[in-house]
Swiss-Prot record:
The lineage of its organism: Eukaryota, Viridiplantae, Streptophyta, Embryophyta, Tracheophyta. NAD(+) binds at R207, I208, D227, P262, L263, T264, E265, K266, N288, D314, H338, T339, S340, G341. This is Formate dehydrogenase, chloroplastic/mitochondrial. The gene is FDH1. One of its GO terms (biological process) is formate catabolic process. It is found in: Mitochondrion; Plastid, Chloroplast. It comes from Arabidopsis thaliana (Mouse-ear cress).
């Protein structure tokens, strides 16, 4: 409660300082007939852009909304160049009205960028997860921040299940043997296990966490979850999962830990050396939430020592991950670029959801309540 009050106080303080030039509050208003400058930041697909007509989440195909926007007189700029003072995005910051980004190639929207963006009214995330935005600064400036809630929850939950099995069965070394022309069954089997009977805990049981638990139930695991809210009894029965209020009580019991919570100031670096030290030796960790929830070097040290038996995920800090990021080179990892939530099916959903919110914005209509991350100076509960 104290932290929530402090957050609100920060917002009010920043808002009141607008008179001194720090932030000018903006109204969520798109007058009918007004031409808007909309900027989208997506990953570039290059030769893959034309290989699938539904590949909408890339620069080249731009969520499939270019013709629609331009037919209404709006300007639509799309780029993948988002870092540094001379990047393409920076050129458009002063006069854009709407900025669209994705978690897979995020445009980091800092307080400094918000201050420069005098016309900015709306920040949209095509997907789920808006931690690339300084939400306190956005709230103080009176901006609206929204995302396409639910658009890729199935995609991410399925990917998490895949990663659990990949780690449990020691799949990656076997694949590497085949590619290298080798054959050494012992080199795989000595640390390959069944999923049945193992204890799996999810830290966070929102939409993705619940779907993962539902998909794990047929495997005959002991399922635990920690969240700020306990599920309804009927949902607990459906998932077969047991609520553990104390995270420190749950973690040492788990053979597999899955991270399913948002990145906030409270969760940033949460899995540090001290917390990792409390985990069961040989624990497997899957993190498709956000890379910054983990303390980078603490993960590397624990994997190299064997305290963490395997680590898999598709989220890094920063993104794209630099070539020298240590998670690329640590043993017993099954890392990929950030792809779990950008399947073709997910792209169709978040492209449609983005278009729907733009239509509502142009008409002056509210978004679906669950899509708001910042509205009227208030942050959504999961980010407080």
């Amino acid at each position: 409660m104290a932290m929530r009050q402090a957050a609100k106080a920060t917002i009010r303080a920043c808002s009141s300082s607008s008179s001194s030039g720090y932030f000018a509050r903006r109204q969520f208003n798109a007058s009918s007939g007004d031409s808007k400058k909309i900027v989208g930041v997506f990953y570039k697909a290059n030769e893959y852009a034309t290989k699938n007509p539904n590949f909408l989440g890339c620069v080249e195909n731009a969520l499939g909304i270019r013709d629609w926007l331009e037919s209404q007189g709006h300007q639509y700029i799309v780029t993948d160049d988002k870092e540094g003072p001379d990047c393409e995005l920076e050129k458009h910051i002063p006069d854009l009205h709407v900025l669209i980004s994705t978690p897979f190639h995020p445009a980091y929207v800092t307080a400094e960028r918000i201050k420069k963006a005098k016309n900015l009214k709306l920040l949209l995330t095509a997907g789920i997860g808006s931690d690339h935005i300084d939400l306190q600064a956005a709230a103080a400036a009176g901006l609206t921040v929204a995302e396409v809630t639910g658009s890729n929850v199935v995609s991410v939950a399925e990917d998490e299940l895949m990663r659990i099995l990949i780690l449990m069965r020691n799949f990656v070394p076997g694949y590497n043997q085949v590619v290298k022309g080798e054959w050494n069954v012992a080199g795989i089997a000595y640390r390959a296990y069944d999923l049945e009977g193992k204890t799996i805990g999810t830290v966070g049981a929102g939409r993705i966490g619940k779907l993962l638990l539902q998909r794990l139930k047929p495997f005959g695991c002991n399922l635990l979850y920690h969240d700020r809210l306990q599920m309804a009894p009927e949902l607990e029965k459906e998932t077969g999962a047991k609520f553990v209020e104390d995270l420190n009580e749950m973690l040492p019991k788990c053979d597999v830990i899955v991270i399913n919570m948002p990145l906030t100031e409270k969760t940033r670096g949460m899995f540090n050396k001290e917390l990792i030290g409390k985990l069961k030796k040989g624990v497997l960790i899957v993190n498709n939430a956000r890379g910054a929830i983990m303390e980078r070097q603490a993960v590397v040290d624990a994997v190299e020592s064997g305290h963490i038996g395997g680590y898999s995920g598709d989220v890094w800090d920063p993104q794209p991950a630099p070539k020298d990021h240590p998670w690329r080179y640590m043993p017993n990892q099954a890392m990929t670029p950030h792809t779990s939530g950008t399947t073709i099916d997910a792209q169709l959903r978040y492209a449609a959801g983005t278009k729907d919110m733009l239509e509502r914005y142009f008409k002056g209509e509210d978004f679906p309540t669950e899509n708001y991350i910042v509205k009227d100076g208030e942050l959504a509960p999961q980010y407080r």
